[in-house]
Each structure stands twice: as C-alpha cells, then as structure tokens.
C-alpha cells in the first residue's frame, strides 16, 4: 500500500494526532501554553486564504510543506516561544506524514481534548425561537447536572423545527422538536393505513 493512501477515516486520524499531542503536553504540564499557541496558529491559518489553500492542496511535496510550516511558525508572534516551537515541530510531523490537509481537524480535535480534560462541553441547542436568559440559564444548569461538567451553549434559531428543542452534546442528541414529533406521527399513520 502506498504512503499517500490510507484506509483510516480522517476523523480518526484527527483524533489520533490530537490525542498524541495532548498526551505529550499534558505530561510536560504545559497544556495551557500549547493551547494558546494552537489558537495563534489557527487564527493565522483561518485569516490567510493562500495559506489555507496551500495546507489543503495535495500538490506540494513534503519538503515544501515542512518548509512553509516552519516559515509560518517563525513569523507568528507566539506568546510563549517554547510552546510555539512545540507547535511548529508538531506541524512538521503532520506534514512529514502527509496529513497537513487534516491540520484543521487535528488542531480542533486537540482543543476538544483540552476542553474534555477540563470537563468543559459545548452543547448545540437548536430552537424554533430565541431563548430567554432564564431559559438559557436553566438549560445550562440542567445539562451541567446531567453531564457533570461545565457546559457552553451554542444556540441556533431554526424556525423550521416549529417548536421544542434539539440538543447535541458530543455524539448524543435529544430531539424534542415538534417537526420530529409530527414526522413520527406521519410515519405511524402511514403504517396503520397500509
């Protein structure tokens, strides 16, 4: 099998690299510094369209990718030089293994590892209408009680769900939307008729 082809799904690759970085920096005790350096790099990457296209392009050699990542990291004003060097080395490893196109997913997965270690979770809430401050607070407190950690709410207003909520935390979802209930009722009625 060639080095440029892998049967491992990319999200799994993202998680493996992210977990490896997290384990290393956790052992060294500098998770916060590395987290800030990762945020600095992601900010530069997300602001620079040319760099974004370069990272996602499969047409550059490993040598070119390593050289560009090293140059980019040298030009970023990292708050902590040592953390910046660790991120730079990590990016060179990613490039050397032909995984640079997965750098967004890897670094975001690293951020999720850090949040999970702090027992911080993001809950995506889809609501038919905006929630009041009191509803947000009650929802947050309820989720924190169930999850056993700090919950950050990411609220999306989507009138097409008609009413109720859809709550997503990690791979779990609770769907109490009126749209889903009506769809279920429609299916049940179709089964009864046929």
UniProtKB/Swiss-Prot annotation:
* GO CC annotation: plasma membrane; proton-transporting ATP synthase complex
Q: Where in the cell is it found?
A: Cell inner membrane
Spell out the molecular function terms from Gene Ontology.
Answer: proton-transporting ATP synthase activity, rotational mechanism
| Topology in the lipid bilayer | Peripheral membrane protein
Q: Name one Pfam family in it.
A: OSCP
Name the Gene3D superfamilies for this protein: N-terminal domain of the delta subunit of the F1F0-ATP synthase (1.10.520.20)
Q: Which UniProt keywords apply?
A: ATP synthesis, Cell inner membrane, Cell membrane, CF(1), Hydrogen ion transport, Ion transport, Membrane, Transport
Q: What does this protein do?
A: F(1)F(0) ATP synthase produces ATP from ADP in the presence of a proton or sodium gradient. F-type ATPases consist of two structural domains, F(1) containing the extramembraneous catalytic core and F(0) containing the membrane proton channel, linked together by a central stalk and a peripheral stalk. During catalysis, ATP synthesis in the catalytic domain of F(1) is coupled via a rotary mechanism of the central stalk subunits to proton translocation.
The UniProt similarity line reads:
Belongs to the ATPase delta chain family.
Q: How does it assemble?
A: F-type ATPases have 2 components, F(1) - the catalytic core - and F(0) - the membrane proton channel. F(1) has five subunits: alpha(3), beta(3), gamma(1), delta(1), epsilon(1). F(0) has three main subunits: a(1), b(2) and c(10-14). The alpha and beta chains form an alternating ring which encloses part of the gamma chain. F(1) is attached to F(0) by a central stalk formed by the gamma and epsilon chains, while a peripheral stalk is formed by the delta and b chains.
Q: Which PANTHER family match?
A: ATP SYNTHASE DELTA CHAIN
State what protein this is by name. ATP synthase subunit delta
